[in-house]
């Protein structure tokens, strides 16, 4: 009886630990995905993800018009709608072309821009992006200059997904002859864990972006890549945060989760976040052998030098560089003494962009069972040993005659 009770207590405790990370993050939403709302023009891509919750709506607006960008707009209304003035959006002055109505329902808005891809020659195989001499860098790929495919055929209302795929048609080296860069978008209507590596845990308050470089011919035999992004915040700035875990079940040898969280000193409401596991993959299979650690570099203020155009200007307006905080950061992919990009000519990196608290990872049932066995076996042996010793000490021998 004591043994059984001990096992039950151990298993119950581990289940509580495993489920603690998901408590309060099980909100569901009614999600829809729409391509170019209000327009039949397929020369540009605007993908609108609308996620309606209990008394609020999160709007995600993805576009490859200018610099590839995702807008996140949170409203405290279940009926808020995205309005697009297509004439103005496609004009040289797109400011004000995007808005969410009713405007007074908007309580938070942010944006993430994907500006450039860096390629450098890692001559010493150190994967040290920031420490590499400038002479080993190739001219960066400016994503605003890419030619982007029509994404309409990739929009899937059932899987809540879409693909934005483009290539550099002006590169004299012809690196994109059979290659492309893609942003795969996946939305979620409830909490869960993604099916593809790195198996990120998500909630209904976020969407996943997967950045892929596939089939692009490297400009050197030992090339590595890095991605430059820009964040936009009205109040406050983004803060880097590293979250460590003892569990590497889904990403072997990788124990770190990185987060960029918006921080405002006087804000009373939640804000946006970007979250990812510190890992990328060098093959489509996402196998352990092709796992690539990735490195985040410090945020850099960008207001005075920001010139890129995107749908962020269409929403935030003319005073974007003056009234908002813009910060750039880089993520590089690769590990010292590891394989270079040319092994498979493939790179995949995934992240979550969302509103509120970033998802908290939790132990799977398999890990909980393993921990229960590992922790419970010594306790079980101790209990059995104690019972046996006690039984022997109190055992009455019938042939024993006490000495007077």
From Swiss-Prot:
**Can you state the subunit structure given in the record?**
Interacts (via lumenal domain) with lysosomal protein MFSD1; the interaction starts while both proteins are still in the endoplasmic reticulum and is required for stabilization of MFSD1 in lysosomes but has no direct effect on its targeting to lysosomes or transporter activity.
Topological domains on the Cytoplasmic side lie at: 386-404
Membrane topology of this protein: Single-pass type I membrane protein
Cite the PANTHER family for this sequence. Answer: GLYCOSYLATED LYSOSOMAL MEMBRANE PROTEIN (PTHR31981:SF1)
Annotated GO biological process: protein localization to lysosome; protein stabilization
The residue range of the signal peptide is 1-24
Where is it located?
A: Lysosome membrane
Q: Which domain of life is it from?
A: Eukaryota
Origin organism of this chain? Xenopus laevis (African clawed frog)
Give yes or no: UniProt keyword Nucleotide-binding. no
Q: Where are the transmembrane segments?
A: 365-385
Output a single Gene Ontology CC term carried by this record: membrane
Q: Which UniProt keywords apply?
A: Glycoprotein, Lysosome, Membrane, Signal, Transmembrane, Transmembrane helix
Q: What is this protein called?
A: Glycosylated lysosomal membrane protein B
Q: Where is this motif: Lysosomal targeting motif?
A: 400-404
* Role of this protein: Required to protect lysosomal transporter MFSD1 from lysosomal proteolysis and for MFSD1 lysosomal localization.
Family statement:
Belongs to the GLMP family.
Q: Which cysteines are joined by disulfide bonds?
A: none
* One Pfam family linked to the record: NCU-G1
Positions on the Lumenal side per record topology: 25-364
Mainly localized where?
membrane
């Amino acid at each position: 009886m004591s043994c059984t009770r001990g096992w039950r207590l151990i298993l119950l405790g581990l289940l509580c630990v495993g489920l603690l990370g998901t408590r309060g993050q099980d909100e569901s939403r009614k999600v829809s995905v729409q391509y170019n709302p209000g327009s039949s023009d397929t020369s540009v891509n605007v993908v609108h993800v609308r996620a309606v919750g209990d008394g609020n709506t999160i709007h995600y607006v993805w576009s490859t018009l200018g610099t590839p960008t995702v807008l996140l707009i949170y409203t405290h209304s279940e009926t808020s709608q995205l309005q697009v003035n297509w004439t103005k959006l496609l004009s040289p002055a797109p400011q004000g072309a995007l808005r969410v109505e009713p405007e007074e329902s908007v309580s938070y808005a942010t944006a993430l821009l994907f500006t450039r891809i860096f390629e450098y020659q890692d001559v010493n195989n150190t994967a040290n992006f920031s420490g590499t001499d400038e002479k080993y860098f190739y001219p960066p790929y400016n994503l605003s200059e890419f030619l982007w495919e029509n994404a309409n055929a990739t929009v899937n209302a059932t899987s809540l997904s879409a693909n934005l795929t483009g290539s550099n048609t002006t590169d004299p080296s012809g690196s994109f002859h059979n290659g492309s860069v893609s942003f795969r978008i996946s939305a979620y209507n409830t909490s869960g864990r993604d099916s593809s590596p790195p198996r990120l845990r998500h909630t209904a308050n976020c969407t996943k972006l997967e950045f892929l470089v596939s089939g692009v011919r490297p400009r050197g035999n030992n090339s590595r890549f890095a991605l430059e992004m820009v964040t936009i915040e009205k109040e406050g700035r983004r803060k880097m945060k590293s979250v460590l875990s003892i569990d590497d079940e889904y990403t072997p040898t990788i124990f770190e989760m990185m987060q960029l969280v918006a921080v405002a000193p006087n804000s009373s409401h939640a804000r946006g976040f970007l979250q990812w596991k510190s890992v990328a993959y060098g093959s489509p299979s996402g196998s352990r052998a092709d796992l690539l650690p990735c490195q985040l570099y410090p945020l850099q203020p960008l207001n005075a030098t920001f010139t890129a155009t995107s749908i962020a200007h269409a929403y935030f307006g003319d005073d974007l560089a003056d009234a908002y905080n813009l910060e750039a950061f880089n993520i590089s992919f690769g590990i010292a003494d590891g394989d270079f990009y040319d092994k498979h000519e493939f790179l995949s990196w995934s992240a979550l962009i969302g509103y509120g608290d970033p998802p908290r990872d939790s132990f799977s049932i398999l890990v909980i069972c393993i921990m229960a066995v590992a922790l419970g076996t010594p306790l079980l042996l101790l209990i059995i040993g104690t019972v046996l010793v006690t039984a022997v000490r109190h055992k009455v021998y019938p042939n024993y005659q006490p000495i007077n």
